[in-house]
């Protein structure tokens, strides 16, 4: 059994990001992978003339579900029960874990096989199973790499995106033999050989396991059908070979009808992997005679989702279909990777989803996440369900600041108080601008930049130059020249820098 590593105790984003930025190999791995995926996405999206209409349709379908979630959940429970499945309701991670562990124990198993699932990562199911003496074997290739390497996932879609091929080879050679079939000592780092080694290692686990655990990409309300979208075939093995199947699914994963599902099956593969369609789409509806699991359990997970639903601004995050398109275009994620976010949900979507599921104002790590963004809006431009991530980030920043009001003011609150005082009167602002212009003369160097400032401003100049303030502020120039109409030098002198344009 491999001990599962968790994000518990991770430092705030700025601290973790600084460490990640110093790792040039990590940055290279992330950059190469994200650029490849986003280039493929752009190509296949351009093939659809109605892609924007599909995005709007998907957003509308999700909003319809969220506005009537109680009704749809009742429909789901009825459909699943009629199909022979057992439905369980879990308010939080602890309750969901207890349900899964009890089912596994009732079948007297000491291991389960798993399909890649963000929901089970969110609730740290592997940790709960291990505590009960039950090994949880990840069967997704990237998840297997993370598990064997005693590592943490760093991407929603490609958890081992921070690893290159040579690193994967070393992990396989070192770790596979400890928990199952060993890798060939002559294993190379060619993708086909690495995949073959993983296939041989996992095959015996598939054939041996009596219980499988999965998540679901979608849950069709009208029939109670669960849908798993994947690329490797491991999901199909987990959903057909074991005798018992336990599916943990977030309550927001519902789509009303099969017609609605069609919209998402066009959007998800294009946004996630840059493919026109995904290689494997597995659907199952309860228990069927003969083939497949003869006992199906579905755990409907809340774990903070109803709290998010109550937030008029933040509830749009529940539209998320876990495609990871936002991560592949995010300049912050590209430079820091996923571990710096301290959550199974990294990147732009993680920066809003994690604080809303956990709650703000509870710990420094969670409170730092909404600030892990440049607010450039690239995430919103590619989101297949039109989540306005920048808007939600600003909304959450406001909540974080409000949660820390009172008591001894921190650096941010002190800075904002000072800014409020300065901007509260035109004379105070003019005096500050004049002082800034004089400081530019003292601190600036040739070329109009400042290379060194005292703390805490040194945090900027330690990494990059700061443009020197102009000798004459724009407000003074505007007043002196009547908006530029009375400035005979305006064609030659820049009002922003006070320097000759030539």
Describe the residue ranges of each PLM region.
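Secondary-structure junction/capping motif
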Residues: 68, 99, 140, 164, ...
């Amino acid at each position: 059994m491999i001990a599962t590593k968790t994000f518990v105790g991770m430092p705030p984003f700025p601290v973790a990001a600084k460490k990640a930025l110093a790792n040039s190999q990590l940055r290279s791995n992330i950059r190469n992978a994200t650029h490849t995926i986003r280039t493929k996405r752009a190509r296949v999206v351009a093939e659809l003339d109605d892609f924007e209409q599909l995005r709007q349709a998907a957003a509308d379908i999700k909003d319809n579900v969220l506005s009537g979630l109680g009704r749809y959940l009742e429909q789901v429970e009825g459909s699943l029960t009629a199909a022979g499945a057992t439905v369980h309701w879990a308010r939080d991670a602890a309750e969901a874990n207890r349900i899964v562990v009890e089912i596994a124990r009732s079948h007297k198993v000491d291991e389960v096989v798993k399909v890649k699932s963000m929901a089970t990562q969110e609730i740290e199911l592997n940790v709960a199973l291990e505590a009960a003496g039950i090994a949880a074997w990840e069967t997704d290739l990237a998840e297997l790499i993370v598990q064997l390497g005693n590592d943490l996932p760093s991407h929603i879609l490609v958890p081992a995106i921070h690893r290159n091929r040579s690193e994967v080879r070393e992990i396989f050679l070192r770790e596979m033999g400890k928990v199952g079939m060993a890798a060939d000592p002559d294993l190379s780092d060619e993708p086909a050989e690495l995949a073959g080694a993983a296939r041989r290692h996992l095959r015996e686990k598939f054939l041996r396991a009596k219980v499988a655990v999965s998540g679901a990409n979608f849950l069709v309300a009208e029939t109670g059908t669960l849908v798993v979208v994947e690329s490797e075939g491991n999901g199909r093995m987990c959903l057909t070979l074991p005798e018992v199947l336990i599916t943990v699914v977030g309550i927001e994963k519902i789509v009303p009808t099969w017609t609605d599902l069609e919209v998402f099956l066009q959007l998800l593969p294009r946004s996630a992997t840059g493919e026109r369609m995904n290689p494997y789409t597995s659907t199952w509806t309860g228990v069927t005679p003969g083939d497949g699991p003869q006992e199906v359990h579905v755990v409907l997970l809340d774990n903070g989702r109803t709290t998010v639903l109550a937030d008029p601004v933040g509830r749009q995050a529940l539209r998320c279909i876990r495609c990871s398109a936002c991560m592949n275009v995010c300049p912050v994620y590209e430079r820091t990777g996923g571990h710096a976010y301290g959550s199974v949900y990294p990147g732009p979507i993680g920066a809003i989803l994690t604080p809303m599921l956990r709650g703000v104002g509870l710990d420094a790590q969670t409170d730092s996440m909404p600030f892990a963004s440049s607010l450039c809006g690239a995430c919103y431009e590619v989101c297949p369900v039109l989540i306005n991530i920048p808007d939600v980030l600003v909304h959450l920043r406001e909540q974080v600041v409000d949660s820390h009001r009172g008591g001894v003011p921190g650096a941010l609150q002190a800075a904002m108080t000072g800014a409020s005082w300065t901007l509260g009167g035109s004379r105070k602002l003019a005096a500050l601008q004049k002082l800034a212009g004089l400081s530019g003369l003292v601190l600036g160097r040739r070329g109009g930049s400042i290379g060194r400032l005292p703390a805490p401003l040194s945090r900027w100049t330690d990494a990059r130059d700061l443009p020197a303030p102009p000798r004459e502020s724009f407000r003074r120039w505007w007043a002196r020249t009547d908006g530029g109409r009375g400035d005979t030098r305006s064609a030659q002198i820049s009002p922003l820098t006070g320097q000759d344009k030539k």
